[in-house]
Amino acid sequence: MSGYKPVAIPTYPKLGEKITQDTLYWKRYKTPVQIKEFGAVTKIHFSPVQPCTYAVTSSTRIHLYGQYSQEPIKTFSRFKDTAYCGTFRGDGKLLAAGCEDSVVQLFDISGKAALRQFSGHSKAVHFVDFTADKYRIVSGSDDYTSRLWDIPNGVEITSYNEHTDYIRCGCTSALNNDLFATGSYDHTIKIFDGRTDKSVMSMDHGQPVESVLLFPSGGLLVSAGGRYVKVWDILKGGQLLVSLRNHHKTVTSLCLSSSGQRLLSASLDRHVKVYSTMNYKVVHSFDYAASILSLALAPDDQMIVVGMTNGVLNIKHRKPEERKQLQSTTKRHPRYRVFVRGKDYMPKQDDIFISKPVIAHLKKYDKLLKGFHMTEALDTVLQPQIRNQRPEVTVAVMNELKRRGTLKNALAGRNEKQLSDLLIFLLKHLVNPQFVPILLNVAEHIIDIYSPVVGQSSVIYKQFIRLQEVLEKEINYQEELLKMLGMMDTLFATMTTKKESPWEEPKPILPLSSQ
């Protein structure tokens, strides 16, 4: 028994992960810093100017954080009820926020008391933003209205009452001082011009709208609601360009990278998706521990901040670029004494040669095979940890049992659970070209052994039906491939021109018949 050879596990080439420039770029973020807030984080907004300060709206407070601070550098708590949508002005000096008590408040970053309070809404205000000229504020409320406010005079300029449900999001144009968009739970996105008394454009998202975003150029608008992210062409009258469905739950927040070439979306499914704005394909994805309500990307893309339903603020900082040290490409050649070392050594007759014994560490299935416990060896490699993560080990043991002529005996005598596990493995890997030769033999033995009693268990019966479907599908697939191969051979044969072989004998020239 000392000459037992362990089962040889074949190795197969694996397809490596496709590494793209986006993968390398978005993976260059450090381990996240997590901060616990007082409630669910409903809004995160970065100051457009340096230093990189961002406002976090949670419960009845708005906290201001520095780029690397883990404690708030300032807190605005002058709210009677839940605060919403803390948003910086373009110069970073003022902050506006809505509240559950229907009041819009305006704060100076250097102070704590409100500079202005705009009253006019009758229900909670969930959306607040500054216009591009910095002198007006746009707000949207649960009273179905959106309003335009004058900051210097503290009065309402105009009011729009076109939505038929809660207004929960909106945005202003970075180029046009009068243009802004609102998204509502009535499934519509409406674009307003502050110089007119009604909307200039309307789009139907098809789901309650949770977030809207205007591109810096002003030509495209992105809306998020339900599981969909939709891109609209404003210059073509609100034409739908693309509808993205890459999330499994409601999409709650949107943001753009500093260059505008990447679009980020956050969802209740705990994922952040990164899209290319060239083809709107997902180029990267982040996973988080809880459902996401808010998302923001720093103006220089150095930070990603995510707010979750459990009140946790997740902050990722980008790693600094590593300086590549120039190394000499010239290898140092070994010295002369390296080559002449030991050339004069002569072994002696009384030298003792000791060889270190090699201890063979056998796997559990090898020990069972060594002891001729065939059924137990097969049961070992059918455990979920082995059959799911290393199916080649399971197939190698089956191949060894076939070589010994004991495969059929090892497959016999199984209960419902053991047979079900074996059929699950077959259904998963039977059409794998690497495993087909041995698994077809295993399938034949199982059909021969258990076909008389297959009707006694509904689970086994369904798996046998599924096995039949898999085999029929694979046979049809092979037949189609053979037909295609025949057509290709015919095409190649017709395209090939016959060339005269130099070894062929020339045809004899027959004499002309005499007149």
Swiss-Prot record:
One of its GO terms (cellular component) is small-subunit processome. Its main location: nucleus. Ribosome biogenesis factor. Involved in nucleolar processing of pre-18S ribosomal RNA. Required for optimal pre-ribosomal RNA transcription by RNA polymerase I. Part of the small subunit (SSU) processome, first precursor of the small eukaryotic ribosomal subunit. During the assembly of the SSU processome in the nucleolus, many ribosome biogenesis factors, an RNA chaperone and ribosomal proteins associate with the nascent pre-rRNA and work in concert to generate RNA folding, modifications, rearrangements and cleavage as well as targeted degradation of pre-ribosomal RNA by the RNA exosome. It comes from the Eukaryota. This is U3 small nucleolar RNA-associated protein 15 homolog. Part of the small subunit (SSU) processome, composed of more than 70 proteins and the RNA chaperone small nucleolar RNA (snoRNA) U3. May be a component of the proposed t-UTP subcomplex of the ribosomal small subunit (SSU) processome. PROSITE patterns: WD_REPEATS_1, WD_REPEATS_2, WD_REPEATS_REGION. It is found in: Nucleus, Nucleolus. Pfam families: UTP15_C, WD40. The gene is utp15. Keywords: Nucleus, Repeat, rRNA processing, WD repeat. WD repeats lie at residues 36-75, 78-117, 120-159, 162-202, 204-242, 246-285, 287-326. GO terms for biological process: ribosomal small subunit biogenesis; rRNA processing.
